[in-house]
Amino acid sequence: MLNNPALLERVDGHALFANAAAMKAAGITAATKDPSGGRLERAADGSPTGVFVDNAMALMERVVPAPTKQQLRSQIIGAIKEANRWGLTGVHDAGVPRAIIDIYEEIARDGAYDLRNYVMVANSDSAINYYLGRGPQNDLYDGRLWIRSIKIVADGALGSRGAALLEPYADDAKNNGLVTVPAGRVHDVAVRALKAGFQVNVHAIGDRANRTVLNEFEQALKEVPVPDHRFRIEHAQIIHPDDLPRFAELGVIPSMQASHQTSDMYWAVNRIGPTRVLGAYAWRTLLNSGVIPNGSDFPVEQVNPLISFHSAVSRQDANNWPAGGWYAEQRMTREEALKSMTLWPAYAAFMEKESGSLEPGKFADFVILDQDIMQIPAELILKTNVVATYLGGKQVYQRPVQ
């Protein structure tokens, strides 16, 4: 293995680990500079250790052999079936390149796309130009694909200390994180999107990234005042108290993933300190914005949506720790948690007239569980199984007889 080029990607997609053979293949040396928005971890002598964070990952990704179209198609169909197995009828798919969207459309034309996918176009000029020129695409292929959104990544992740913070990390005093997009990019794309009827969704985890995105959204909305824009900040994990009310004021939707809180809570206070953590994973406070779509962020977290449901209502891990919940005052009620995974994501995707609830005129998308998650004790939620999944009235998953 030591002689073969090898790359491992961190689960959150914000760091790569390369061995010496891989770095040699990519031409990485001590003289290789950190790119804007990226970082190479280095030894004391300045030589790269093999850890590439955020935009530095591209230095290694350029030498990775590309999968074939058939491999991608097979993986996509497999992922759809896996999503159905866990009770998913729809997803919001962030940062998708045009080549992958083309495969989605091909599978949908073949009648094999058993999922409703709200696609966020990747942040590349060529893809943005193409899809803005094409215009918003709603309800394609019997409601399988919706293409009317653009995804931008504004900073890194908390786990790899790449989330952009206003003040240094509590456990890394010389590091404020990484800004992964040029200044003004969010504003410029937002202006174009508003004029074309598109939504903009921006990944922002740190308080500096969240503030910057809110500022650039605010300026764009002054220039192109569209009332029902439904711009989103994806994750919105760490927010300065001064910025919490700005979501509601600007009509920006905080799109969060409850399972991040229960994954991060073991080290979050050490990472950002006891004061900043009060503005982290602050769902109850952000509910003043009206809606909080709640997803899983798979494959960063597990695909099972009940993990996020359980996290939202308990703020505990699968072992019911900590007792009473982590900063339990920020919990959601079960009704709020259910809406955060049904009605509110539909609204956040301009799909509330077609999806999000079982009503006349809407898609007959639903899941049958073997327990009532609205009534059982919280500690039993994660022991719930999916019995069957239906999309448009068609059964797309049936649990095998045990």
Regions flagged by a language model, labelled:
Residues 144-162, 251-262:
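Non-cysteine beta-strand/loop elements that form the S-adenosyl-L-methionine
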Residues 127-130, 264-268, 304, 399-401:
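Short, charged, surface-exposed secondary-structure boundary motifs
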Residues 190-201, 205-231, 235-236, 241-245, ...:
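His/Asp/Glu-enriched, well-ordered alpha-helical/loop segment
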Residues 138-141:
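Accessory "access/gating" subregions that flank catalytic or transport cores
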Residues 52-53, 163, 297, 368, ...:
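Short clusters of small/polar residues that mark proteolytic maturation junctions
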Residues 158-160, 245, 378-380, 400-402:
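Short conserved micro-motifs at the rims of enzyme active sites and ligand-binding pockets
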Residues 1-133, 148, 152-209, 222-225, ...:
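Divalent metal-binding segments
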